[in-house]
Amino acid sequence: MSDECKWLNESVPSLESASDATVRGSAGKRAYEWIRDAILAGEFAEGEFVDEVVLAARVGTSRTPVREALQRLQVERYVDLVPRRGAQVRVVTAVEMREIYQARFVLESDALRTICTRRAGVPDAARELVLQMEQAGSARDWNRFAQLDQLFHSEIVRHQRNAVIADLYDSLQPRQVRLGTRTLTEAPARLLTIESEHRDLLAAIDNHDAEGSVDVLRRHLREIPELVNAFSR
């Protein structure tokens, strides 16, 4: 067999493998997004066990992409994989809520002080995200609002130009979005307050007011007793 034929024979399987991987990847992505969005929408209650076979039928895939999706969702703390029982939707506790807010305050307040000290101003993307959030709020699309809210705060953190801190902040993204969705589902009246605080935050950054912006952030992330009571202890 010529070297050219050998090369062709070796190449064809690798192309097929790449194609198979693409199909598996797209199915896994679809399964991941479907299950994640169902959890965020409250279709699966906290503490509920979800069955791989049922999920595969609803997503329209085999069990393998569903299993891979659940493994990713475990890493992102949407579910816990319990031996011999399967995937259980994680319960968001009041303690976890406080810890997420505390972590956010540490990272975001540092970013605000840096941005204001450097007089860097508001990132353009943040202004656009505020407008998009107001549209999502008007539509009462809490999941969409929470996703945009995370992007808004992430843009501000990234604006201080510290890639390590930005990556640390974004590692909170899955829990931040889930918590935001749950917050507005439990207390939709908070929407107007949240939107007002976003505008106040932008104004403080525009004025290069470091401590003023941190004060707004502190109000924005403060504990609301009636909201904390909605979460498990």
Task: Give the positions of each predicted feature.
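Short linear motifs at protein or domain termini
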Residues: 1-117, 225, 229-233
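Hydrophobic side-chain positions on well-ordered alpha-helices
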Residues: 38, 43, 136, 157, ...
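Hydrophobic, amphipathic alpha-helical faces that serve as interaction scaffolds
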Residues: 103-118, 150-188, 227
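Amphipathic alpha-helical dimerization/coiled-coil segments
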Residues: 108-135
